[in-house]
């Protein structure tokens, strides 16, 4: 054995050993790399036999022959290390009829290989020389009795008689006239021994094998292999075509072993009906014998197999609907047999293999352990993101989405996460308890050209339904829906910021640049917006808001030309003492009417977020909106004194038209640069601002007990002032416009 005597021990023996009838002990062992093996321990006096067996095992390589690993000399004897196997005598009780039939076929192939390719004879084919590997295949061992056909002399046979099975010795060797068999009949001795072994195994076969086939096979054995005349025993290859070896399991196994030799037509026909043939087999047989043959690169490359068979093997059995074909394996068998194979396939970097694995990942991924998912599956799946194949990248992204539910986004995606998408959705069912920002003044506080989204039925969620007359047409494009503003308030839109209300129609001069950017309060700013609204609509509109005492709902329904809306509550102010004006530029002016010869401004800054107090319900309000196509867009409610109701002024005009404000359209700005724009003086308004005559466009004749209503251009929406004590310019120190000193 040469250098093997000094070789370090590279395995560890496990207890207990199994002792063969010949006295040979077989130990299970574990190699240094973690693989399993079997160690045959021979006595030192049998060193020649061990060397002979090791020589044959090294030179003879066949799937049905025991695979040799190493041979060393130890203190307790000579150790022959092979692949992990167990004696057939131990495993026979756990095997099914199909496995026994397939095992007999394996031993038959091994003997044919020895006879035809090696020109050797085994000389001891018996139960103790057959072993079962981990994958279920039967392996032929006991190679210490193997010799060439010409060397099987009577003397050699007598030398190995102590380790031979007496039942396997043919009758001709008992004759004193026995001589060496000729080369053409060298297989006769092994044929008889094989016939004896098969006959003993047929007794354990159950009803899975047809009685007719079994009876026919037994007759063939007696007439051929067990024939007492050696020359009448045919070669073992003649048994390969017998019906005993024509079962579904064996045919599937044989076809898969020779898959590379089959034509495309044969493979298509085979995989097309493979599911029907495999379904009749036991789950244990499929898991132990067929799974390694079906889950490999060759089968994954067959389109028919991928479409018609693999979906039923790549997932465990589950509750299925009526008429659906269930999967082949139970969850327990799938976990123990299929998952280890899939782990190995994930390390195969072939495109067609990865496509098949990821296409069915949802069916089996939950059967991996957390450690397997993190250390094997996830790293291998992530490799697909860097592949040049678009299909690999697409299926990889889909698989990562599946892994998120098992490993969590922190493991799959990595890094810190932040809330980017907020849960905001428009709500179309809200109560009518309106705060200041829900009031009609705030809802209709901006010109429709400033807001691009124009929604239909804007007041349906603001006012009670009883105020809508069935015969009153409403042009929904002229209004702005309250839900739009609610959405802006929720999402942090500039409209949700506190609005600074101007005094006397003039914006606060102390507004910062940030405020001017966030809220378009000037008409100039609004003109710079793109015209996303309806361009074909008339530019001039007049909207009058009048405050009336409460009337029954039936009276309101009788008005067909106006839209009267009754508000249940107003916040933060009293209806009898507050006038609210909305200018076209988006600013809101709030003033108190003159009651005792002095007028005081209302604070210009009202917060939309502070808690509001309910208004007094002594004077409920109605809001009437009248549209005119020839007037500019303006909304201005008339003033109502706290002591008296507004009196109706008899005139030739229509009802309420005396309060209509005639507004001139703002002139278009000169495109040329104004070199003196920075020289315009900045004049802060006093407590009461005197309206200059040039700013007035129309004055309604003063009537008794009626406050005059003045109309101004769209540039200034100044409050009505009747006092003349407040002066914009000093009377005594009038400015000299010709003076060059200032």
Curated annotation (Swiss-Prot):
Modified residues (Phosphoserine): 439, 707
InterPro entries attached to this UniProt entry: ARM-like, ARM-type_fold, CIK-Related_Protein, HEAT_type_2, Kinase-like_dom_sf, Prot_kinase_dom, Ser-Thr/Tyr_kinase_cat_dom
Name of protein: Protein-associating with the carboxyl-terminal domain of ezrin
Assigned protein family: Belongs to the protein kinase superfamily.
Expression tissues: Ubiquitously expressed.
Assembly with partners or alone: Interacts with EZR/VIL2 C-terminal domain.
Disulfide bond positions: none
UniProt-listed Pfam families: PK_Tyr_Ser-Thr
The Protein kinase domain, residue ranges: 2-245
Keywords associated with the record: Cell projection, Cytoplasm, Golgi apparatus, Lipoprotein, Myristate, Phosphoprotein, Repeat
Compositionally biased spans, kind Acidic residues: 529-539
Region Interaction with EZR, residue ranges: 548-742
One example of a Gene Ontology biological process annotation: protein localization
GO CC field: cytoplasm; cytosol; endoplasmic reticulum; Golgi apparatus; Golgi membrane; lamellipodium
Free-text comment about domains: The protein kinase domain is predicted to be catalytically inactive.
GO molecular function, one term: identical protein binding
Lipid group attachment sites (N-myristoyl glycine): 2
Domain of life: Eukaryota
Cellular localization per UniProt: Cytoplasm; Golgi apparatus; Cell projection, Lamellipodium
Origin organism lineage: Eukaryota, Metazoa, Chordata, Craniata, Vertebrata
PTM summary: May be myristoylated; myristoylation may target it to Golgi compartment.
Chain positions covered by the region annotation Disordered: 506-544, 568-598, 629-652, 723-742
Chain's role: May play a role in regulating cell adhesion/migration complexes in migrating cells.
Start-end of each HEAT repeat: 199-238, 285-323, 333-370, 372-409
